Regions:
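Metal-coordinating catalytic core of metallo-dependent amide/deamination hydrolases
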Residues: 130-277
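His/Asp/Glu-enriched, well-ordered alpha-helical/loop segment
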Residues: 262-265, 269, 309-388, 405
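Histidine/acidic-residue-rich catalytic or RNA/ligand-binding cores of hydrolases
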Residues: 72, 242-254, 282-287, 304-314, ...
Length: 451
């Protein structure tokens, strides 16, 4: 259905802009933005007087599979370091996931992301006991909520060669399904695959990998081959903890990013999550390749791994949550306050630009104009019930983002021109959904207790 939003205060992050206009939404896009637009036949008119409309938020690094971890059974003992956090908590959780719990984790995580005003997720998935078609399970859950997603499966050597190869194949299958394979060249290649389903409007893939310290050179090389085959980037954790840096130096006499570059697993579409302990040479290599750095401040604080050298990164800094929900208003606020504590010298405006970089990343992956309200841009939008107690103008927009706006103000969410949340109500039956999720989590937790 086409919509006409009347009397809206609109904001965009890049460029920072605040204005007042009507917006016509048609065919999944902003068809027109102007003052005093006249309603057309068949159009639903929605009065947004006193409300703010803006492009939806993007989360550049998350793990939907952790959504049912909230309140999970305590590990056998208290982890003493980051490696033990992985071994005693997260690697046990991902091994316990099955088809049902993958689905409910993704569904709950996607719904809570939508309620926070996040319309696109870059999800990094792992479920070593149920690898094949796991990305389609995540996709189905996200699609039910109505979100946009860029998915990948975590390739690692942790489970041996068979599971590594299954992870690679899962990435390959999803990339092919998402229509990201190059145009068929050989004359005998069947065209049936592309005719089987319409190329999805709201899903894309990347090649996923865990981290340098759980990947052999051979594994990095096959990841690189897949990246070249589908012309996509790698989504990987780098130097989150010193263990990653020390392992690369001890076993390969190399920096973490240097290893990726040597094996061909680094390009301008790559997402390097964390980067907490990257040295100058590795940062230089990443910058020369044009790779993206995904900062995850709340996760870094929670895991006590340190603070990333953000001032040395390029302007391709992103913001992620590493699985702690997908509330980008909250993550940006934590990022701002932590940067102040670390005396980084950044104000609120730098974090406005980082949030805008997330939208720019998504625009590049989808080949669409996201993060804009111009005519022709994709209608991934959120409506905020935010009453500014002080003037709201382009020059102080960032300060309102950090000190005023929050996910509690999100009233409506639209993805690809369709409402996902409307007047704070989702398109789903939330009560039944959460009841089913609780049952699934109890079964998941029972598995954890047996490990």
């Amino acid at each position: 259905m086409p919509y006409l939003f009347k009397s809206a205060t609109f904001i965009t992050l890049d460029p920072a802009a605040v204005g007042r206009a009507d917006l016509r939404i048609e065919g999944g896009r902003v068809a027109e933005r102007a003052a005093q637009l006249e309603p057309r036949a068949g159009e639903e008119v929605i009065d947004l007087s006193g409300k703010i409309i803006m492009p939806g938020m993007v989360c550049a690094h998350t793990h939907l599979y952790s959504a049912l971890a909230r309140g999970m059974p305590a590990p056998p003992r208290l982890p003493a370091n980051f490696k033990e956090i992985l071994e005693l908590i997260w690697w046990r959780l991902d091994r316990a996931l099955d088809e049902e719990t993958i689905y409910w984790s993704a569904l709950v995580g996607a719904l809570e992301a939508a309620r926070a005003g996040t319309t696109c997720l870059f999800d990094h998935h792992a479920s070593p006991s149920h690898i094949t078609r796991s990305l389609q399970i995540v996709r189905a859950a996200m699609e039910k909520v109505g979100l946009r997603g860029v998915l990948c499966y975590e390739v690692t050597n942790r489970g041996g060669r068979r599971r590594r190869d299954a992870g690679l194949e899962e990435n390959r299958a999803f990339l092919a399904w998402a229509g990201q394979s190059p145009a068929p060249a050989p004359a005998d290649r069947s065209q049936q695959d592309t005719a089987m389903h319409e190329i999805p409007a709201t899903f894309r893939g990347m090649v996923g990998a865990h981290a340098s310290f759980t990947l052999s050179d051979a594994s990095l090389e096959v990841c690189a081959e897949l990246m070249r085959e589908f012309d996509v980037g790698l989504h990987i954790h780098v130097a989150e903890d010193l263990i990653d840096v020390e392992d690369a130096r001890a076993r390969y006499d190399s920096g973490v990013i240097e290893r990726l570059a040597k094996r061909g697993a680094l390009n301008g579409r790559t997402i390097l999550a964390h980067g907490t302990h990257l040295g100058d040479r590795d940062i230089e290599i990443a910058r020369e390749a044009g790779a993206w750095f995904a900062h995850n401040p709340r996760s870094n604080m929670n895991n006590q791994v340190g603070y990333a050298p953000l001032a040395k990164f390029s302007d391709k800094i992103l913001l992620g949550t590493d699985g702690i929900g997908a509330d980008m208003f909250e993550e940006a606020r934590f990022a701002f306050f932590k940067s102040r504590e670390m005396r980084l010298g950044w104000g609120a405006d730098e974090w406005r630009r980082v949030l805008a970089a997330n939208q720019r990343l998504a625009s590049g992956v989808f080949g669409l104009e996201l993060g804009s309200l111009d005519s022709g841009s994709v209608a991934d939008l959120i409506v905020l019930d935010y009453a500014a107690p002080t003037p709201l103008v382009a020059e102080n927009l960032a300060w309102h983002l950090i000190f005023g706006m929050n996910s509690a103000a999100v009233e409506s969410v639209m993805v690809n021109g369709q409402f996902v949340i409307r007047q704070r109500r989702s398109v789903l039956d939330d009560e039944d959904l959460y009841s089913a999720a609780r049952q699934a989590s109890e079964r998941l937790w029972a598995k954890l207790r047996e490990m």
